[in-house]
Amino acid sequence: MTLIYRKLSLPVLLLFLTLNTQAQQAPRPDDFSRWETAISAFEKADQAAPPAQGGILFIGSSTILLWKTLAADFPGYPVINRGFGGSQIVDATHFADRIVIPYRPRQVFLRSGGNDINAGKSAAQVFADFKDFVARVHAKLPATEVVFIGLCPTIARWKQAETNRELNRLVSEFAQRTRHVKYIETYNMSFDESGRPRSDIFIKDMLHFNAEGYRLLTTLVRPHLSR
């Protein structure tokens, strides 16, 4: 590993590798091989310091990957961060046997779906992918609670706001009728009084949260963590 890589934290390194791979070659849909570097890095980290069984797993795309304050935001909770930037729900499902099931978590918080919609999937398609993820987890961990952290609009992807809302609705209704599935509403957290997304909770790309964005997200997620 080069010197520059040694200086990067694991989340930043994974995001760098992901973006670098995507820049070199636009992958075909469901080309899971593009995530092998990120998943292998997680497995190596697990070998060096195995997470405790029965913890609280956070998985998903860049919102999870870049949540660098996750452990500090939830003191006293055994949280595990397994976000990989640019990923879709199908990717989390595909790699569940490697970065979900081995931890036997009591809860799995999934924040994903935005990249799916940005890639052209409908809310119904993303919802179907979410149900597949739940089925994969519950096939081996039937008592594990799967918690979907709902999507909220961003300035960079404002045109997808209604699709985000529709996906949230589908997941929310599914959670109400499905055991060990929960939904967290976040849609309104990014709106100002005029009904437009707040610019003060995003970094310059107007897509990813800054510290204030994560502070707000933390307040919405915290009540749903299980002791």
Language-model features: locations:
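Catalytic His-Asp segment of secreted/periplasmic serine-dependent ester chemistry enzymes
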Residues: 13-15, 153-227
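Structural recognition of the beta-strand scaffold that forms the well-ordered cores
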Residues: 56-59, 79-83, 107-112, 145-150, ...
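Extracellular/periplasmic catalytic domains that process cell-envelope and extracellular macromolecules
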Residues: 49-52, 73-74, 101-103, 139-141, ...
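A generic secondary-structure signal
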Residues: 45, 95-102, 136-137, 224
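Charged helix-capping and loop-helix junction motifs
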Residues: 123-133, 163-168
